[in-house]
Amino acid sequence: MAAAREQSAGGDSQVAAALAETAEVADAAGVRPVTGPGLVVTLTDAKRDAYGRFPRDASPDDLVVHQQDVEGVLNALWSAGAEAIQMQDDQRLVASSVPRCVGNTLLLHGRTYSPPYVITAIGDADAMQAALDAAPLVTLYRQYVARFGLGYTVTRGHHLEVAGYRDAVGPGRAVPLQGH
């Protein structure tokens, strides 16, 4: 009986250790939701003026948010130590996330989004704001904001929420075809 109890106690500690390791992996993989203070950055295409016009010297490319604009914001936030980032209302970014512009839309995790592009980041708001202010691509984008009317807002939040990543984590497994 004593041997059974010892074995059971050892099993309990192994289960506890496995659960702790699983929790660490889940956090690193971004599958758990995160809440906390941070920033919300919104990027929008240019709007027409009161007369329905854009600036005369603007080309169509000057008036829309591009992939490098989104990447500039994301890289600044990550470099400042963001704990978790999501785009739009439901797309948690993880190591394998690659937002891509397709025409005037953004493709992320197999879904297509139109502006405004809303980026929520959990972390030290002061550090992330400083990183945004110092990032060359964000500085260039803000010049286009001033010149062509693109949209750029940064708001602070004390209780922001970032969803957990919902898609499969990690690469799939290749299986060779029979007879080839």
Where are these regions (language model features)?
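Juxtamembrane "stalk/linker" segments
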Residues: M1-L43, D49-G52
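Short, charge-rich amphipathic segments
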Residues: M1-Q14, D62-H66, P136-L150
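Envelope-exposed proteins and targeting segments
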Residues: A2, T35-L39, L43, G81-E83, ...
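A generic local secondary-structure boundary/capping motif
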Residues: A28-V31, L74, L107-H109, L150-G151
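Solvent-exposed coil/turn segments that connect beta secondary-structure elements
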Residues: T44-R48, D90, I122-A125, Y165-D167
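Short, flexible active-site loops
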Residues: Y51-D62
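Soluble extracytoplasmic domains of inner/organellar membrane proteins
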Residues: P60-A134
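Extracytoplasmic/luminal low-complexity segments enriched in Pro/Gly and acidic/polar residues
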Residues: G123-H180
